[in-house]
């Protein structure tokens, strides 16, 4: 009998796992970019395959959502945001509107406990209610100055059909005091469904928040609207930053009587027409196909970050980190007093080194990852000279007294053991230094194969790779070769790939031997000269 119970238990677990992602098999319609793929952000994604009600909220709900607004505001017009009107029935989220008396309504709402930030794709599958109320899937920053409306629909339109047949796709930028509101206007913000009311069926509503100045809207997997820089913040409410802040996700319904007709108490009491049904919500980040640029603790073994501003260029395959990137799966634990600059591409600077994060304060960068040994490469430098920059990892000093001249970029790497699922990197400045300044963080798991290869080449995992490490492209060059200094004429240079295979052999004819990199795929190689080896990283 016990075996039968166990069998039923495992079947239950299996069914729960299968149902956990109701969107399986539905591709993300947005393009993540060359060499990139979509990675699910589980902490803000939900199939709602559990029961939840006020006073009975399971961890599946409370770990991700709260049934209230981001602050104490109770809603627009005749709205009263109220927790009992947000519930789940085992397969869907219900956002309900019910009569509150005196012409007002109790309205359901949920707000994410975890924030999202571009680049990110977010989508729900939902069916709006048959009411004059607004049904909305949107995002809002803590300071309430930046809002993205992925969808805002009105299920019925008393006296006409115009609103019922159109879906509002928009965004807002605000000044809070004195209150000033901008949102784009015109027919392009109201997507027409060919005459069919949106309330008649479930639809998928998505938005790719690509960067601070680009929004792509999708309905049922089709791109229906793109918003670019000219429309994002033409009145400069945000001081030129665009939609750049980390933001909460909100799903709610609203009785917007400040500009819409009010729902009657009788209409609100009709349970067949007063529920905004949400089947699921899914959120994705673009990450490198190879694992480079990945940012979650899902077994990825490589994480590549290009540090800069919210809008500066990002090296292909890398993920942006700005001075406002707060630690979630990755980022700064404290963003106070961290600056960012884009120095431009003059003097041959490439997109890795043109932009930086910097600070005079000690700051921690964290990365969620699986336990193991990792090689961490950091690129230091700026258009100004920097002194005595230091890095510690997992509480151990790894790099000290790193100095760079004006316009010089230096890469240093080290290995570190992680046993708590999170890598902590501490950046600081020693005596005589003003700020630390970095352009890149590259984290790669060290496998047993790579350890054996290093040992075979006369290196150990503990050996620091300092001036003997090459990076291609060179920060100030774009030629398709690297130069190996102090080469012995008549000897041979052998290049191995990370699997230990010989990929090139060159006879040395110059003390500064040039090696062509034509045909080299991106990755890590090892240059061997007279028994001495060094890394070559081709990007």
From Swiss-Prot:
PTM field: Proteolytically cleaved into mature beta-agarase A catalytic chain (AgaAc).
GH16 domain segment(s): 21-289
Binding residues for substrate: 73, 82-92, 96-98, 144, 176, 271
Localization, UniProt: Secreted
Catalytic activity: Hydrolysis of (1->4)-beta-D-galactosidic linkages in agarose, giving the tetramer as the predominant product
One GO biological process term: carbohydrate metabolic process
Induction: When cells are grown with the low sulfated agar.
Keyword Transmembrane helix recorded: no
Xref: InterPro entries: AGA-YXIM_GBD, Beta_agarase, ConA-like_dom_sf, Galactose-bd-like_sf, GH16, Secre_tail
UniProt region (Disordered), positions on chain: 332-353
GO molecular function, one term: beta-agarase activity
Keyword entries, A-Z: Glycosidase, Hydrolase, Secreted, Signal
Top-level taxon of the source organism: Bacteria
Pfam families: AGA-YXIM_GBD, Por_Secre_tail
GO cellular component: extracellular region
Family: Belongs to the glycosyl hydrolase 16 family.
Record-given protein name: Beta-agarase A
Gene of this entry: agaA
């Amino acid at each position: 009998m016990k075996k039968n119970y166990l069998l039923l238990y495992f079947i239950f677990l299996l069914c729960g796992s299968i149902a956990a992602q109701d969107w399986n098999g539905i591709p993300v319609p947005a393009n993540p970019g060359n060499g990139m793929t979509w990675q699910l952000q589980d902490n803000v994604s939900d199939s709602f395959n559990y029961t939840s009600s006020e006073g009975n909220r399971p961890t599946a709900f409370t770990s991700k959502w709260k049934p209230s607004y981001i602050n104490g505001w109770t809603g627009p017009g005749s709205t009263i945001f109220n927790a009992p009107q947000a519930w789940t029935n085992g397969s869907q989220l219900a956002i309900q509107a019910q009569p509150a008396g005196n012409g007002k309504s109790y309205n359901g709402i949920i707000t994410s406990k975890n924030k999202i930030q571009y680049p990110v794709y977010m989508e729900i599958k939902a069916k709006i209610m048959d009411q004059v109320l607004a049904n909305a899937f949107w995002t809002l920053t803590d300071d309430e100055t930046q809002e993205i409306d992925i969808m805002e629909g009105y299920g019925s339109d008393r006296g006409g059909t115009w609103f019922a047949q159109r879906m509002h796709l928009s965004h807002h930028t605000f000044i809070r005091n004195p209150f000033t509101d901008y949102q784009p206007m015109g027919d392009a913000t109201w997507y027409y469904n060919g005459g069919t009311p949106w309330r008649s069926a479930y639809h998928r509503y998505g938005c790719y928040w690509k960067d601070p100045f680009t929004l792509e809207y999708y309905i049922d997997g089709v791109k229906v609207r793109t918003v670019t820089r000219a429309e994002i913040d033409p009145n400069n409410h945000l001081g030129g930053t665009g939609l750049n802040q980390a933001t909460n996700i909100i799903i709610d319904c609203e009785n917007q009587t400040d500009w819409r007709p009010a729902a009657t108490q009788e209409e609100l009491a009709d349970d067949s027409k007063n529920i905004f049904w949400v089947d699921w919500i899914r959120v994705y980040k673009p990450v490198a196909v190879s694992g480079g640029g990945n940012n979650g603790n899902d077994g990825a073994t490589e994480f590549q970050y290009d540090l800069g501003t919210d809008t500066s260029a990002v090296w292909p395959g890398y993920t942006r980190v700005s001075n406002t990137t707060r630690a979630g799966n990755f980022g700064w634990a404290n963003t106070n007093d961290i600056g960012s600059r884009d120095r431009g591409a003059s003097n041959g600077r490439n997109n890795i080194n043109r932009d930086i994060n910097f600070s005079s304060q000690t700051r921690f960068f964290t990365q969620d990852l699986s336990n193991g040994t990792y090689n961490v490469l950091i690129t230091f430098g700026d258009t100004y000279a920097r002194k005595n920059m230091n890095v510690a990892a997992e509480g151990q000093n790894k790099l000290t007294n790193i100095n760079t001249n004006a316009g010089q970029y230096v890469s240093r790497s080290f290995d570190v053991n992680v046993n708590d699922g999170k890598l902590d990197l501490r950046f600081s400045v020693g005596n005589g230094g003003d700020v630390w300044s970095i352009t890149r963080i590259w984290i790669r798991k060290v496998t047993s194969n790579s350890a054996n290869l290093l040992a075979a080449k006369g290196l150990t995992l503990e050996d620091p790779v300092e001036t003997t490490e090459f990076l291609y492209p060179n920060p100030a060059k774009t030629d398709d070769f690297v130069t190996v200094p102090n080469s012995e004429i008549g000897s041979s240079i052998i290049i191995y790939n990370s699997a230990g295979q010989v990929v090139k052999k060159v006879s040395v004819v110059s003390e500064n031997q040039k090696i062509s990199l034509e045909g080299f795929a991106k990755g890590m190689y090892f240059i061997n000269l007279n028994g001495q080896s060094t890394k070559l990283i081709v990007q």
